[in-house]
């Protein structure tokens, strides 16, 4: 039986030390699975630091391709551009999308790819069952999960770490909404199978995300569900009218917060929506 193509897509911005460590661990873990020709697609998000990819002989990785974006656009758009490139350049393949900092553990790839091969109509998502951040960060994350669920009725406890057959890419890229958040586009447009894994430890340095970045990312995840959010907020308002009609203050605050949320989501959409992925960010292709 002919080996099937499997391409691991990794967005990178400046963190080349982590990428090199990740490639070593990916190569080691891929030895556990047979029947696949494994390749790596690195989407360089216009890094300002010198590109350093150590050319080692990888027994289980046949090719490494570097996609150099002309301008920095963030990991979510970088993933969308990478998927768009794969969709137009290859046919009948498997893809694993993962971050390059070590938090997505390479040891999970074999399990995810095996499931993706068995269930080709599904996207396999790696959900975090235990987080190692501070209590404050975990609290914020849980607030985000609950907030998103109450607005969208979707429990989005996974990030970029996903595996799937190539036929799912057209759904993920539907209406170019994956540029907001890969996870939201997956759960909105695809059937998913959840697996659960511990979050890995970053190889080097700490995350540069601050509180405002986390809030914006939470809003980006919700942006794909704007129509549903409008509907759910109306339903909640009807509930308030029935049970709290005498409390003008509650109604006023709720209306204000609802419209404030609509405005924030509108601004996020305006900032991040890409009308045409193929024309948005020109790139240079380089084989390592």
Give residue ranges: language-model regions.
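Cell-envelope/extracellular polymer assembly enzymes that use nucleotide-activated donors
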Residues: 5-7, 39
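Short, well-formed alpha-helical segments that are part of the catalytic scaffolds
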Residues: 15-31
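Donor nucleotide-sugar binding loop of glycosyltransferases
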Residues: 15-19, 47, 105
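Short beta-strand/loop segment that forms part of the nucleotide-sugar
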Residues: 35-47, 67-68
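A conserved acidic beta->alpha catalytic loop
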Residues: 44-53, 102-103
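Acceptor/aglycone-binding surface of glycosyltransferases and processive sugar-polymer synthases
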Residues: 70-71, 76-85, 94-97, 103-179, ...
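Catalytic donor/gating beta->alpha subdomain of glycosyltransferases that bind UDP-sugars
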Residues: 170-229
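Membrane-embedded multi-pass helical conduit in multi-pass membrane proteins
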Residues: 230-288
């Amino acid at each position: 039986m002919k080996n099937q193509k499997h391409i691991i897509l990794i967005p990178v911005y400046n963190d080349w030390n982590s990428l090199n460590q990740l490639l070593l661990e990916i190569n080691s873990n891929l030895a556990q699975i047979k029947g696949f020709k494994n390749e790596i697609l690195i989407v360089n998000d216009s890094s300002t630091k010198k590109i350093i990819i150590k050319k080692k002989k990888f027994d289980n990785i046949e090719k490494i391709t570097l996609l150099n974006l002309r301008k920095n656009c963030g990991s979510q758009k970088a993933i969308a551009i990478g998927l768009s490139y794969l969709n137009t350049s290859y046919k009948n393949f498997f893809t694993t999308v993962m971050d390059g900092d070590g938090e997505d553990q390479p040891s999970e790839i074999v399990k995810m790819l095996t499931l993706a091969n068995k269930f080709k109509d599904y996207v396999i998502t790696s959900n975090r069952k235990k987080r190692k951040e501070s209590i404050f960060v975990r609290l914020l994350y849980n607030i985000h999960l609950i907030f998103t669920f109450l607005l969208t009725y979707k429990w989005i406890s996974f990030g970029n770490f996903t595996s799937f057959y190539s036929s799912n890419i057209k759904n993920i890229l539907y209406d170019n909404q994956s540029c907001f958040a890969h996870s939201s586009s997956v759960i909105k447009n695809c059937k998913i199978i959840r697996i659960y894994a511990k979050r890995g430890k970053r190889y080097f340095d700490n995350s540069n995300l601050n509180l405002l970045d986390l809030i914006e990312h939470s809003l980006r995840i919700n942006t794909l569900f704007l129509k549903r959010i409008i509907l759910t907020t109306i339903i909640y308002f009807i509930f308030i009218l029935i049970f709290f009609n005498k409390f003008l203050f509650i109604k006023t605050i709720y209306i204000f917060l609802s419209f404030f949320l609509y405005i924030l989501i509108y601004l996020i959409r305006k900032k991040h929506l890409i009308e045409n992925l193929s024309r948005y960010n020109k790139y240079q292709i380089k084989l390592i």
